[in-house]
From Swiss-Prot:
Belongs to the UPF0441 family. This is UPF0441 protein ETA_04310. It comes from the Bacteria. Residues 166-223 are annotated as: Disordered.
Length: 223
């Protein structure tokens, strides 16, 4: 029997590669896509204080207290600061403001206020805390603020120091957020003018709506 002398080696190699490498490539791609998804989001719980956290997580009282205290320390550094109580109250409502602790991150932008320690900041309305797989509790937390001023975009909402909105200021609920939401925010280095933080919240709301609309459009097109 004669053997064919001419073999299309290029075609053979291409066929072998397609059969043997394509499934491997697909598997590797799937792994990377799964890893990206796992790194993109975090399930967090919203609490008003350590007691709320402890009630929802029996046996985790110590971790709840640690997370709450860490969030308060973070709030002192990153919360919006105002040169007067009136400016803070106009933004957050009566009974929602306190004097900022000394050395709470504000630079020497106002010598008189700095020397008298009269910077003002909103009270921490709650905090979000990360959760690990299997019901464990993460080591990250983020202070949250809320306004009771009817004219503020943050009225009745949980917002972080950057003005990002996390929905109704209802302790005890959980939600999925980007992992970046738990990243420490920059320390406040200057005071904001009356209404300035509300403008930040409004801008963040617009960005979030636009992002949601873009995501919905991509999904509808199969993207």
């Amino acid at each position: 029997m004669k053997r064919t002398k001419q073999i299309n080696h290029a075609s053979f190699r291409k066929s072998w590669s397609a059969r043997h490498l394509t499934p491997v490539a697909l598997a590797v791609s799937a792994v990377f896509m799964l890893a990206a998804c796992e790194q993109a989001d975090e399930t967090v719980s919203m609490y008003q204080n350590a007691d709320d956290c402890s009630a929802a997580n029996p046996g985790k009282s110590e971790q709840c207290t640690t997370a709450f205290n860490s969030a308060k320390e973070e709030a002192a550094k990153t919360a919006p600061k105002y040169a007067s109580r009136a400016d803070c109250v106009a933004e957050f409502g009566e009974g929602q403001c306190q004097q900022a602790p000394a050395q709470a991150g504000v630079g020497n932008t106002n010598a008189e206020s700095q020397s008298s320690g009269s910077f003002w900041m909103p009270l921490m309305a709650g905090y979000m805390m990360g959760r690990l797989m299997g019901g464990g509790m993460g080591g990250q937390q983020q202070p949250l603020f809320s306004s009771k001023s009817p004219t503020s975009p943050a009225n009745g909402k949980f917002v972080d120091a950057s003005g990002k909105n996390y929905g109704a200021a209802t302790p005890g609920r959980t939600m999925t957020v980007p992992k970046s939401a738990l990243a420490p925010k920059p320390a406040t280095t200057s005071t904001v003018t009356r209404g300035g933080f509300g403008e930040s919240v409004a801008k963040q709301n617009t960005m979030q709506r636009n992002s949601s609309s873009t995501g919905s459009a991509n999904r509808s097109m199969g993207g």
